[in-house]
Every structure is written in C-alpha cells, then in structure tokens.
A protein has these predicted regions:
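Short loop->beta-strand "edge-of-pocket" segments that line small-molecule binding or catalytic clefts
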Residues: 29-40, 124-145
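Bacterial N-terminal signal peptides that target proteins for export
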Residues: 1-11
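Extended ligand-binding regions for polar small-molecule ligands
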Residues: 47-60, 116-117, 126-141, 213-259
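Ligand-binding cleft/hinge of the Venus flytrap
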Residues: 53-63, 104-106, 126-130, 141-167, ...
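Extracytoplasmic small-molecule ligand-binding "clamshell" domains
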Residues: 25-97, 165-166, 254-255
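A ligand-binding cleft/hinge motif common to bilobed small-molecule-binding domains
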Residues: 74-75, 81, 89-99, 149, ...
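N-terminal signal peptide c-region/cleavage motif recognized by signal peptidases
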Residues: 19-21
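Periplasmic-binding protein-like
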Residues: 34-37, 106-110, 118, 198-241, ...
Length: 273
C-alpha cells in the first residue's frame, strides 16, 4: 500500500518499477508445436522442445503459450506469417521461410541395427545392404533423404517405409528390435530416444557419407525460427541460446539425442537481418 508521506521522487520510482514488472509479466511467447510428435513435443509438454521452450520463456520472463498444429505443408504461411504464433523451436538452420537463430544442436541420420547383428559397420555403399530389409521414414508419402539415397543405389526393393508421425513414432525402431526389418535409417533424435527403451539391444551408427553427392545431406544443424523481420525476438533467442547452451545440451542428452559438433561459424551470433 502506498504511504501518503512518500516524497514525489520516491513515488515516481516505485511506479516505474511496478510498470516494468507488469510489462515483463505481460510478455507472451507463443510457440507453434506439434501436439503428438515425441520426442520433440506433445500436448502434455513432455518433449525436449517443450523443455527448451520452458527454459527460453523463463529466461525472457515471458508467459509460455502453445499453438498446437502439425508442422505440415503451409504451416509457416498460416501460423507464423499471420502472427498466430511467434516461434518454432526446431527448424533446419537457415530455413528460408523463417528468420533463424544460430543453431543450438546438430545431429544426423543413423543406422539402427540389432546389437547382435552380423552387421559390424555399414555405409550407404555397403554391398551387404543388398538383400536386407531396410526401414526408412516416409513423410507425406515421400522418402526422407535415406530412402532417396538407397533408391539411387538400386535398393528400392529392400526399402520398407514407416510413417513415424503421431502414435506411430516408435514403429521403425520397434521393427528393428523385433527383427521385422534387418536395420533402419532414422533421424537421430527419434532413433536415440526410442532405442533406449530396448535396453542396449540396439546400436546406432551415423550414416556415411554425411552428404550424398551431388548434395543430399544426412546431417542437419537445428535452429529456432521466427517470422521474417522479427529481429528483436531472434536476437533475444540467440542470447538465451548462448547463455544456456550447457543446459540445452543436458536436455538433449536426457532424451538420447545423438549430437555432432557445430562448426565454429555456426555458433557466431549475427545481429543482421
């Protein structure tokens, strides 16, 4: 309660402090997230991207809210560009439809192989892949990069496609564990998270080469993305990523995300457009 005996200067200082506190508390961070996409996010907020979003909001003193939407074709236009949400926690670095932060982790596709398998080392060019059943992820009826690379090598008949969205996310890893396929090529964060459920029965090996000529990548650096032109929020996010890098990597490790080193230039903060 205000005292009637406060001097005007003191009263003005208190009012400014209250106004600043109210402004910080009123800031809202609206995150676009998939409601059923573990280990990344879900509506129960148990994914690692949910955890990272909480860390960001806490650092910014913002109230975290979610706009739940499957990250399909057109979501940037409908949700980010139309200001229904402010931020996507995980997009490829330099994702053109958005203004992206510095990357905060880098991962790769991995081979998921039974630990007792005769396959000791494997690459996309391994002759022993011929005649095996090879699981690959299918996205919107299209192959992910591993499927495309295998098809280029004449291995179309060996490919077994898996929809890994929603409740089927674990299906491709489970198929390896249950010997329904001989091995699978899976995006690292998904593979690492679900492989742990099989208590050492599976091993993960990075896909080689990292880039399939002439230019099909198997490793990706991951950034946060905001609406183009929103440099203020992008810069705030980059400060959070730099300040809390070790905490973010701890979260990723907790979820079994296989990480690769970021290139030094990828960790340099840019303040431009």
């Amino acid at each position: 309660m205000f005292s009637p005996f406060l001097k005007p200067a003191a009263l003005a200082t208190i009012l400014l402090l209250i106004a600043g506190t109210a402004s910080a508390q009123s800031r809202e961070l609206r995150v676009c997230a998939d409601p059923d996409n573990m280990p990344f996010s879900n509506i129960q907020q148990r994914g690692f991207e949910n955890r990272i979003a909480e860390l960001v909001a806490r650092d910014l003193g913002a109230h975290l809210t979610y706009v739940w939407q499957r990250m399909g074709r057109g979501f940037v236009r409908e949700y980010i560009d139309k200001s229904q949400c402010d931020l996507v926690i995980g997009v490829p670095a330099n994702f053109r439809p958005l203004l992206t932060t510095i990357p905060y982790y880098r991962s790769s596709y991995v081979f998921v192989v039974p630990r007792q398998s005769n396959v000791k080392s494997v690459s996309l060019d391994s002759p022993e892949l011929h005649g095996l059943k090879i699981g690959v992820q299918v996205l919107d009826e299209n192959y992910t990069p591993p499927g495309t690379a295998l098809a280029r090598r004449g291995l179309q008949n060996e490919i077994v496609g898996f929809d890994t969205t929603g409740e089927d996310a674990e299906s491709i890893v489970r198929a390896v564990a249950k010997h329904q396929v001989d091995l699978a090529v899976v995006w690292g964060p998904l593979a690492g998270y679900f492989a742990r459920r099989y208590r050492g029965a599976l091993k993960l090996m990075p896909v080689e080469p990292e880039v399939d000529p002439p230019g099909l990548p198997f490793t990706f650096a991951i950034s946060m993305g905001v609406r183009k032109g929103n440099t203020a929020l992008r810069n705030d996010l980059q400060n959070v990523l730099s300040t809390h890098s070790s905490q973010i990597h701890d979260i990723l490790a907790e979820y079994g995300v296989p990480e690769l080193p970021l290139a030094p230039q990828q960790t340099s903060i840019s303040r431009g457009q």
